[in-house]
Curated annotation (Swiss-Prot):
PANTHER family: RIBONUCLEASE H2 SUBUNIT A, RIBONUCLEASE HII. Its EC number is 3.1.26.4. This is Ribonuclease HII. One of its GO terms (biological process) is DNA replication, removal of RNA primer. Belongs to the RNase HII family. Transmembrane segments: none annotated. Endonuclease that specifically degrades the RNA of RNA-DNA hybrids. One of its GO terms (cellular component) is ribonuclease H2 complex.
Length: 201
């Protein structure tokens, strides 16, 4: 049985790029770019959403240790509200690729569109479950963002951020209507915007 993606698919100097956090009502959108080293296999790479939290945490450390190059980047809430979530995500992906210590010959982007990059790039739909470097990027981005949301839960208690990570769950929406938005809530997202509109009236 093949555990995770086949590491033989890893190509020289190909960066995988992915994002986490497009859907949440609060917090940054986090991206990562990873160039894997074909001579240093990492077993069990897969789409971060298909892995347990413990497995993601272990792989997070292994990827950072064994990858040829990696970079975690972000776009802040203010940028999301100013640019819109799609453009903010593209900006964060651009930052991740530009932050790599090794220039890739190709960047493979999870999804159906590419940011503007100085290197050739191609989109790969469902890339996080097909391309090992994109799977690695998805793990770095998710673990990094999840850890940050746990920290933000301590700063803004009562919203349950450590659990839902900012996504619009029933618990989050109820807390939002009861407590109002925090400075890290995305004012351009409908549930937050509607609350602010009501409070202005």
């Amino acid at each position: 049985m093949q555990l995770g993606l086949d590491f033989n698919l890893v190509e020289d100097l190909v960066a995988g790029v992915d994002e986490v956090g497009r859907g949440p009502l609060c917090g940054p959108v986090v991206t990562a770019a990873v160039i894997l080293d074909p001579s240093r296999p990492i077993l069990g790479l897969n789409d971060s959403k298909k892995l347990s939290e413990a497995r993601r945490e272990a792989l997070f450390e292994e990827i950072r240790e064994k990858a040829l190059a990696w970079c975690i980047a972000r776009a802040e809430v203010e940028e999301i509200d100013r640019l819109n979530i799609l453009h903010a995500t593209m900006l964060a992906m651009q930052r991740a690729v530009e932050g790599l210590s090794v220039i890739p010959r190709l960047a493979l982007i999870d999804g159906n569109r590419c940011p503007k990059l100085a290197v050739p790039c191609a989109p790969v739909v469902k890339g996080d479950s097909q391309v090992p470097a994109i799977a690695a990027a998805s793990i770095l981005a998710k673990v990094s963002r999840d850890r940050e949301m746990v920290e933000l839960d301590r700063v803004y208690p009562g919203y349950g951020m450590a659990g839902h990570k900012g996504y619009p769950t029933a618990v989050h929406l109820e807390a939002l209507s009861r407590l109002g938005p925090t400075p890290i809530h995305r004012r351009s997202f409908a549930p937050v915007r509607e609350l602010l509109d009501v409070s202005v009236q």
